[in-house]
Amino acid sequence: IAAWMLDDAMHSNGDSGNTEDIKLWGMWNILGEELFNDPSQEEIRPWYYTWSLMCRYFPAGSTILHTEMDAEEGLFVAAAVKDGRHVIAAVNVTDADRELSLRLPAPLEGASLYRYQEENRPTDDEGLPLPLESGLSIATSYKTSLPARSFLLITNMN
């Protein structure tokens, strides 16, 4: 999977190079104020949050782990390990809260937990994702609720 359109300003319709005809579907638009008189277009857009976490914590060379979920429930899970460190990501694509029960291959020490919801995604001053909790000790089984239309990532990777 690749996210090609990071910055709207780098891609115009038909590759014309015309900055007034740029595609508005990237993670930000560095020309928001200059061309559109809208500085808010220069802010990092919400889809950057989950994408950046997945890129950071599922690095090249990771071993993807087998997961078992009932997709009809609207929950999807991915997990990986690299250098003895683990990551688990889960998404609830439904309009209802769901309960999530995880069985992990090993306990996670010093883990961080990230949650994303449209109206709640903790970030630092630059808009980069911040963990909701850190320094967690998670046993080989873990239960949590996953709100409707939300994303969860748990990792002990640095």
Language model regions located:
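Aromatic/acidic polysaccharide-binding cleft in carbohydrate-active enzymes
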Residues: 1-58, 62-75
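Active-site proximal loops enriched in glycine and acidic residues that flank catalytic Cys/His/Asp
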Residues: 4-6, 90-93, 104, 115-117, ...
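Flexible loop/turn segments at secondary-structure boundaries
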Residues: 8-15, 95-98, 120-123
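Acidic Ser/Thr/Pro-rich low-complexity disordered segments
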Residues: 21, 118-135
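Ser/Thr- and Asn-enriched, surface-exposed coil loops between beta-strands
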Residues: 65-71, 94-96, 134-142
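Carbohydrate-binding surface patches
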Residues: 70-108, 153
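Solvent-exposed beta-hairpin/edge-strand motifs
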Residues: 105-125
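C-terminal beta-strand-rich structural cap/linker in extracellular carbohydrate-active enzymes
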Residues: 131-158
